[in-house]
């Protein structure tokens, strides 16, 4: 084990990862139809074994209750029949989306008979580490197969029974298709998940989904590229020129529709000129919705009961708790977001078009919204079918990452005996003529 506590991979883990890698190489060369059929078979198998999966989840929930698991984690852990049915529908919808592979992004004649193209291809093998949410196994497995990638998944121990039941069903579905069952696998121990971080050369991308601590640890302890976000500290700024009724609906939805989500707001910023009017309606509305408000001095003077400390501004509650601050103007709101935001999703409520456009240009987050809930920051709601996670990094992919974020590209050059010397010595000339991209 190295100084940071990450062990060397065992022989069994190396064997598993090698098998996934080999299956991924074949999968990456499969046809769109083969991958679509694989997804439909996975969905059918999940449906056939729904009772087994829900029963396994009940075991996990009972153990979570006995262990005193935090309410936010319990909410993510639950996979009842309705939630499972929704996840299965998502797999089927994903199969109908446009094939992300083989898309020709560039088609160029470099010289007579020498043609270059840039075509989308799979990344290879995804290593996905997540906490609680067992439906993530379904989403990630489906996205991986659809995009031609293998996947090694490791869920939290709190969802062990559910994850195993789901993976068993997925593999049983793949067994009747041309896609190898080895393209997907599940790790079950903490030692394996740590050693996964050492599999550079076998794993091409690590995707962590979970707490700030989990993501930070992974980023600090692997040479494999990491896609993800460490925090979801999202804001709603209520401008001085605003439809208060509309803004309140947006605020309530952004906080309460699913408070355990990373795209729920954690801080409400209100312009001082509208604060007396807006908070008069907002405070009782939030209280009725069961939200605990913590505010600065100005907001407490307007009805917010609890005191917000400096720690609250950077806190991802994942619960029915909301920090409230009254700001003197637009610029102070921007400065607060720059200082405390996590570059996930920020929103403004305003009827002033110029103010909205300035906000949309100035805020450097993966998602920046005008007059709508932050809860729309989601791959399914964006029409991606599903997502492997949300990335807050500046380099792409950014925001909800669906199929397009799980592919890279390859340059292919076809010639007729061309050599570079002919061009450098003047016997041949480059034409650099763009051709229609069309299909591969």
UniProtKB/Swiss-Prot annotation:
GO terms for cellular component: cytoplasm. Its EC number is 1.2.1.41. InterPro entries: Ald_DH/histidinol_DH, Ald_DH_C, Ald_DH_N, Aldehyde_DH_dom, G-glutamylP_reductase_CS, Glu-5-SA_DH, GPR_dom. PROSITE patterns: PROA. It is found in: Cytoplasm. It is an enzyme of class 1 (oxidoreductase). Its main location: cytoplasm. It catalyses: L-glutamate 5-semialdehyde + phosphate + NADP(+) = L-glutamyl 5-phosphate + NADPH + H(+). Belongs to the gamma-glutamyl phosphate reductase family. Catalyzes the NADPH-dependent reduction of L-glutamate 5-phosphate into L-glutamate 5-semialdehyde and phosphate. The product spontaneously undergoes cyclization to form 1-pyrroline-5-carboxylate. This is Gamma-glutamyl phosphate reductase. The gene is proA.
